[in-house]
């Protein structure tokens, strides 16, 4: 099967995607390559590419841009890293396709719904092509909710979570977003009294400051962690469409840790 066959299926869907200006494109390689194995991942790091090389896989579907930054004014270190990654891909005949705009809100299998399902909370039905989901009354403290989430995200190599605000406050309507689309203002206007946000989806000097002033607790998750379930779920979807192809989700397993260091009062010397 040619890579183009898989891309054509993906690009034939998604009325919410602006195909005249989209992130969903081949970023490197040839769409006519014949393949029998495919990797899905959150981002095609060097480690993911090495996995592809070791397993003779020549097509990677990456949710995020594996080339760091798209610009004509690049830091030299990024420019150099891009060229090194491109050389590695070319040497091993690997094509990378970015599937972002389609998969963010693809029903059931996509990023938004897979994240909500992974959290295993009582969510309302999703609406249209919104990036946001909201729970029914979960009646949990912020700390209880955070611990529940920690238990659900362990497969994605995040070992802790950040809470901003009163951890004893009761959550009734939790709002969650999709990846970096975690706008606390939009979730608040839809009735959320606490928000699960990504580290790339909130700013400390704007969203966090406002949430603190308005008693809206925030639970902060890593961007990768909240999107990985959707890229894992893509394997199930594509396997049904192309049963003759082997699809494998490769996790970005670099590890995300929150270390709690208790600092004691300094010892005062007597002179």
Q: What is the predicted role of each segment?
A:
Residues 1-260, 264:
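Active-site catalytic microenvironments in core metabolic enzymes, especially phosphate/sugar-handling
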Residues 263-271:
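A short, hydrophobic C-terminal helix/tail in secreted or cell-surface proteins
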């Amino acid at each position: 099967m040619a890579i183009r066959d898989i891309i054509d299926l993906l690009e034939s869907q998604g009325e919410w995607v602006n195909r005249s200006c989209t992130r969903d494109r081949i970023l490197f390689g040839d769409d006519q390559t014949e393949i029998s194995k495919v990797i899905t991942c959150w981002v095609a790091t060097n480690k993911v590419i090495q996995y592809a090389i070791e397993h003779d896989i020549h097509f990677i579907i990456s949710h995020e841009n594996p080339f760091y930054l798209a610009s004509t004014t690049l830091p030299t270190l990024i420019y150099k890293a891009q060229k090194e990654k491109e050389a590695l891909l070319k040497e091993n005949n690997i094509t990378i396709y970015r599937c972002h705009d389609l998969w963010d809100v693809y029903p059931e299998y996509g990023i938004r719904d897979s994240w909500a399902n992974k959290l295993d909370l009582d969510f309302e039905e999703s609406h249209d092509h919104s990036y946001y989901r909201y729970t029914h009354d979960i009646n949990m403290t912020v700390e209880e909710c955070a611990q529940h989430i920690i238990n659900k995200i362990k497969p994605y190599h995040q070992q802790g979570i950040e809470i901003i605000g009163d951890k004893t406050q009761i959550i009734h309507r939790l709002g969650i977003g999709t990846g970096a689309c975690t706008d606390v203002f939009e979730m608040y206007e839809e009735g959320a009294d606490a928000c699960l946000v990504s580290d790339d989806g909130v700013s400390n000097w704007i969203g966090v400051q406002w949430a603190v002033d308005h008693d809206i607790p925030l639970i902060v998750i890593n961007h990768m962690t909240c999107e990985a379930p959707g890229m894992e779920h893509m394997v199930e979807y594509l396997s049904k469409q192309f049963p003759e192809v082997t699809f494998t989700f490769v996790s970005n397993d670099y590890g995300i840790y929150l270390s709690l260091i208790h600092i004691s009062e300094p010892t005062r010397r007597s002179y």
